[in-house]
Amino acid sequence: MGDQSKDIILSIRGMSKSFGRNRVLDHINLDVRKGTVMGLMGENGAGKSTMMKCLFGTYQKDEGTIYLDGKEVNFSGPKDALENGIAMVHQELNQCLERNVVDNLFLGRYPVNSLGMIDEGRMKNEASELFRKLGMTVNLDQPMRNMSVSQRQMCEIAKAISYNSKVIVLDEPTSSLTVQEVDKLFDMMRMLRDQGISLIYISHKMDEIFEICDDISVLRDGNLVMTKSAKETNMNELITAMVGRVLENRFPPVDNQPKDVILSIQHLSTKYEPYLQDVTFDVREGEIFGLYGLVGAGRTELLETIFGIRTRAAGRVYLNHKPVSYTHLTLPTKLEV
């Protein structure tokens, strides 16, 4: 990446963190350039989230030094990090769903007027101006519960920007988004990058990493094993860095032969919201059955209905070709569901 020390906005030196005898981070050195997107990759358990939580003050590092804009910093907690220019948008959004957009934006830092009362007019004005600059049209009075995951995520990013953040960490932000929503998110990220804000983008999705990132770093077993410009690396090199070996066959042939149907779901519908409608599928013995969908699609509700937690409105569940009757929760467990 050359000599770019004058462009470094965030520098981590020798960061280590252990939980008991488990060494999660081992003397990590990482630089993030101003006005760039740094992709952070690694297998599950590599240390990505722990590293960012140490940066954000959620965890306290055991060793190491953090420099922000050339100055050494050590945050006592997330509030301290936010007030000093580092924000983090978690994969699981931390929002009060029953409150509106404005309340969530100013939660914990409500402005007050000369009488010591919450200045709601100022809050709305500042929120409107913030979303205008971001090119977003948002109903400020709308409860967060009524917004899509994508809209809620954009609001969380707007909140991070409202702290005048220099660095924003995005922890797998596209895991619950559609292709169109990902495009909107990337447009916003490019706009922030052009404004000089640096972003750390955690993801497992290679195509997205190469589309949006300027630099890419890889963690493996708590060690930083690679940092390169996105233009100077490729997918195979990233995979090798992540797993620690060359994968000769990324998609080996499957020779497993599933046997007879062991679980059959027929025309399953639920009685209460969120509704399931006419769900039918079979699971065979010795088969790994994948269940895919975005947040809110009904995956959890489906499994809870099969297990007997939710009430069925229609449909049947068959185990070993015999209908299952749910009278209480102990029955499914006795039937090995």
Map each language-model feature to its residues.
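Single conserved hydrophobic/aromatic residue that forms the stacking wall/gate
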Residues: 328-337
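Glycine-rich phosphate-binding loops of nucleotide-dependent enzymes
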Residues: 2-329
